[in-house]
């Protein structure tokens, strides 16, 4: 048990709380402590009955059962792996900036969910984070099932197809990829590559709540992966080795 505790405490703080909630809320629903009916994002209940908790619970809940358990575990792994890589990598020392990215993506996903009657938001938020990681490390070579290898920028779309095979739907993954692209475009591509204004800026109250541990620069300024490729490759990260021939989570 001490090994599990040490592993859990080693997870970056924001990812750790997100991971814990994504385990706890489905477990609460599975055990019947709270009816899962209260966890879904139902527009009528949220907008007209003022059940304001639903966007939060819909972000962490997933109906785990014989037909969905594998899909849940795969996406829980994606959450741990890529949220950890972002928080401890590109966002290292800047928890406020990382939390702002999650909040921006989450708000976009909630609005989309209300408009499209999407009742569960766990997969879209995870995929949006994975998409941002893939774009910041777009030229790294990742490995997938059966020894397939490709650039990281294609990983979100490969996973979209993979989740379609095991889950039968691509809407959640597609929404997550599009929201992740919106954040990446507004935060990086438009101001840095196209010379446009910066539309996204982390609010100062988040810096007061979660101060940067180094640098003290307001706003997130890590360049895209094309400028960081050598440093990242020297660090040895970025391999997605959990397919055939690799142990889950190997680097």
From Swiss-Prot:
The modification N-acetylserine is found at residue 2. InterPro entries: DER1, Rhomboid-like_sf. Residues 229-251 are annotated as: Disordered. The modification Phosphothreonine is found at residue 202. GO terms for molecular function: ATPase binding; identical protein binding; MHC class I protein binding; signal recognition particle binding; ubiquitin protein ligase binding; ubiquitin-specific protease binding. GO terms for biological process: cellular response to misfolded protein; cellular response to unfolded protein; endoplasmic reticulum unfolded protein response; ERAD pathway; positive regulation of protein ubiquitination; proteasome-mediated ubiquitin-dependent protein catabolic process; protein destabilization; response to unfolded protein. Induction: Up-regulated in response to endoplasmic reticulum stress via the ERN1-XBP1 pathway of the unfolded protein response (UPR). A motif (SHP-box) lies at residues 241-248. It is found in: Endoplasmic reticulum membrane. Residues 2-15, 90-94, 138-154, 190-251 are cytoplasmic. Functional component of endoplasmic reticulum-associated degradation (ERAD) for misfolded lumenal proteins. Forms homotetramers which encircle a large channel traversing the endoplasmic reticulum (ER) membrane. This allows the retrotranslocation of misfolded proteins from the ER into the cytosol where they are ubiquitinated and degraded by the proteasome. The channel has a lateral gate within the membrane which provides direct access to membrane proteins with no need to reenter the ER lumen first. May mediate the interaction between VCP and the misfolded protein. Belongs to the derlin family. PANTHER family: DER1-LIKE PROTEIN, DERLIN. This is Derlin-1. It comes from Mus musculus. The gene is Derl1.
């Amino acid at each position: 048990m001490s090994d599990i505790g040490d592993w859990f405490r080693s997870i970056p703080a924001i990812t750790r709380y997100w991971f814990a909630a994504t385990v706890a809320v489905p477990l609460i629903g599975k055990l019947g402590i709270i009816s899962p009916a209260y966890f879904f994002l139902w527009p009528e209940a949220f907008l007209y009955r003022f059940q304001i908790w639903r966007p939060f619970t819909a972000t962490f809940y997933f109906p785990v059962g014989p037909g969905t358990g594998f899909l849940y575990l795969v996406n829980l792994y994606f959450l741990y792996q890529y949220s950890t890589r972002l928080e401890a990598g590109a966002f290292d020392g800047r928890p406020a900036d990382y939390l702002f990215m999650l909040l921006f993506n989450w708000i976009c996903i909630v609005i989309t969910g209300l408009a499209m009657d999407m009742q569960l938001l766990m997969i879209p938020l995870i995929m949006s984070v994975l998409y941002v990681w893939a774009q910041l490390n777009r030229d790294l070579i990742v490995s997938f099932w059966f020894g397939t290898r490709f650039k990281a920028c294609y990983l979100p779309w490969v996973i979209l197809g993979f989740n379609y095979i095991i889950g039968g739907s691509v809407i959640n993954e597609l929404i997550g990829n599009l929201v992740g692209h919106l954040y990446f475009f507004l935060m990086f591509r438009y101001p840095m590559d196209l010379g446009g204004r910066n539309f996204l800026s982390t609010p100062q109250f988040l810096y007061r709540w979660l101060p940067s541990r180094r640098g003290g620069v307001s706003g997130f300024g890590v360049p895209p992966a094309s400028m960081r490729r050598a440093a990242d490759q020297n660090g040895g990260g970025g391999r997605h080795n959990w397919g055939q021939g690799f142990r889950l989570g190997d680097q």
